[in-house]
UniProtKB/Swiss-Prot annotation:
Pfam family, one: Trp_syntA
Name of the protein in its database record: Tryptophan synthase alpha chain
Organism the protein comes from: Klebsiella aerogenes (Enterobacter aerogenes)
Function: The alpha subunit is responsible for the aldol cleavage of indoleglycerol phosphate to indole and glyceraldehyde 3-phosphate.
Any one cellular-component term (Gene Ontology): cytosol
Binding partners and assembly: Tetramer of two alpha and two beta chains.
Residues annotated as catalytic: 49, 60
Coiled-coil features, chain-numbered ranges: none
Entry similarity comment: Belongs to the TrpA family.
EC number, UniProt record: 4.2.1.20
Reaction catalysis annotation: (1S,2R)-1-C-(indol-3-yl)glycerol 3-phosphate + L-serine = D-glyceraldehyde 3-phosphate + L-tryptophan + H2O
Amino acid sequence: MERYETLFAQLKNRQEGAFVPFVTLGDPGPEQSLKIIDALIEGGADALELGIPFSDPLADGPTIQGAALRAFAAGVTPAQCFEMLAAIRQKHPTIPIGLLMYANLVFSPGIDAFYAQCARVGVDSVLVADVPVEESAPFRQAAMRHNIAPIFICPPNADDDLLRQIASYGRGYTYLLSRAGVTGAENRAALPLHHLVEKLAEYHAAPPLQGFGISAPEQVSAAIDAGAAGAISGSAIVKIIERHLDEPQTMLDELKAFVQSLKAATKTA
């Protein structure tokens, strides 16, 4: 959890926002997936947001669902994902690693056992996409016991009560939704976030990162101009993987270049 605090302090000193890519672990196969993570980090990723493939992803658009299906086709299991996480952590000791996942994958080993496993492999945060704040007590309590940051989604229409809860229970960062709906680069982000960002700051919430529909450098700049601490991009990155399944090296080069361009947009100095 402390890796996020360290990162945000360093970025503040450098007058930069955070750029955080999302990919599904094991897409398109375990070996290439680890190379993808390396390419994202070489491109300048400040933190990682990683999905564990799940058969029924409610909040995901077709792009991210496709990533999960490719990982399944390659035989990737949650146990294998944890082995990959341990390998990523060993190779990259300082980068914050977040998981974005669904409750069934947490229930399956048992809530406490799941967070204990996260702590063992060096995961810093967990966002459980289908658990609303008001039902989050068992998850966030287990997370805190194991020094894992519980991450909450702040929707664009959040009322004051919800903002206070998110600020009170969340750690690490706050996932600021650009808009309601499923993920995807097609629906470009276009909501004024100043109000939410100001309220979250007033309630001392963890730094907000804007996600959903981030696919171009100007959207990253706009998120930071609105007061967000950075931006998360998922579908646009997974589309690069999808486009180059037959050209693994081109895929890695394109991913690195894409991250470099969006990371460059976080530099405000």
